[in-house]
């Protein structure tokens, strides 16, 4: 943080709270008197700038527990690293800029990737395996914007490609790249449907068969698939 913003890092004024149905004491509210477990379930985890605290879903039947059971505890670490990314934004003034939500979410994904990259390179107190990194990416994809949604809609987090791309930028290039994403954001993958037919196909390209003429193949898919694969693997 000092290298990126020229100031010392200030620890959270609040804390990191685990939310679960049986929790005996109330969770602090974010603009409300208290935070309910249902509120936390909706977001899986969130950072509250008003109280400078983080809450995450620690319920045994919650999505985070399900992902951790399937893919490992690395999912929890990367989700919390994303929320700490928002805490960084609070301290650096990014959250005061009234940016589109997806812009701040991209930077938070990038900071999570930078933290995971450090762990994967054994540069900190925590070490990550490839499986841990993969688990974190899966967790991000679980809360991606659905196909057809404009990423600039209120609350947009980015399509799956957007989230993975931001994570990768941080993982490979480090936190300095993340700091630049406000002025130099990553391009977003088109996520909206072009027309009604596109919506009916859920954004998938036509397979390339003309059902009106049996046996006659339309080369739409094959027309762009082969050049794309050659470009990727070339």
Language-model region placement:
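Active-site-proximal beta-strand/loop segments in catalytic clefts of secreted hydrolases
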Residues: 20-21, 57-60, 79-82, 90-93
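Short, structured motif recognition centered on aromatic/hydrophobic residues
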Residues: 1-4, 79, 106-116, 164-167, ...
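Short pre-active-site segment immediately N-terminal to the catalytic Zn-binding motif
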Residues: 60-78, 96-100
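Catalytic Zn2+-binding segment of zinc metalloproteases
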Residues: 83-99, 114-121
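Catalytic zinc-binding patch centered on the HExxH motif and its immediate surroundings
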Residues: 18-55
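Structural recognition of the beta-strand scaffold that forms the well-ordered cores
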Residues: 53-57, 87-89, 109-110, 114
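Short helix/loop segments within enzyme catalytic domains
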Residues: 5, 103-105, 109-146, 223
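Pan-zinc metallopeptidase signature
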Residues: 145-232
């Amino acid at each position: 943080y000092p290298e990126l913003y020229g100031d010392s890092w200030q620890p959270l004024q609040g804390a990191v709270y685990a939310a679960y149905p049986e929790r005996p004491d109330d969770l602090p509210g974010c603009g409300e008197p208290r935070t309910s477990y249902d509120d936390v379930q909706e977001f899986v985890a969130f950072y509250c700038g008003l109280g400078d605290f983080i809450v995450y879903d620690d319920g045994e039947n919650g999505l985070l527990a399900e992902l951790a059971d399937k893919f490992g505890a690395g999912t929890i670490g990367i989700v919390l690293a994303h929320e700490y990314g928002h805490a960084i934004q609070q301290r650096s003034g990014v959250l005061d800029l009234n940016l589109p939500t997806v812009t701040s979410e991209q930077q938070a994904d990038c900071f999570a990737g930078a933290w995971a990259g450090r762990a994967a390179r054994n540069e900190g107190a925590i070490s990550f395996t490839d499986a841990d990194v993969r688990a974190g990416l899966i967790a991000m994809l679980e809360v991606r914007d659905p196909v057809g949604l404009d990423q600039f809609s209120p609350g947009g987090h980015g399509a799956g490609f957007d989230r993975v791309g931001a994570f990768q930028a941080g993982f490979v290039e480090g936190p300095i790249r993340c700091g630049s994403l406000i002025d130099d954001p990553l391009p977003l993958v088109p996520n909206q449907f072009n027309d009604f037919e596109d919506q009916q196909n859920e954004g998938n390209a036509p397979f390339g068969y003309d059902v009106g003429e049996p046996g006659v193949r339309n080369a739409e898919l094959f027309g762009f698939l082969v050049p794309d694969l050659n470009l990727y693997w070339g």
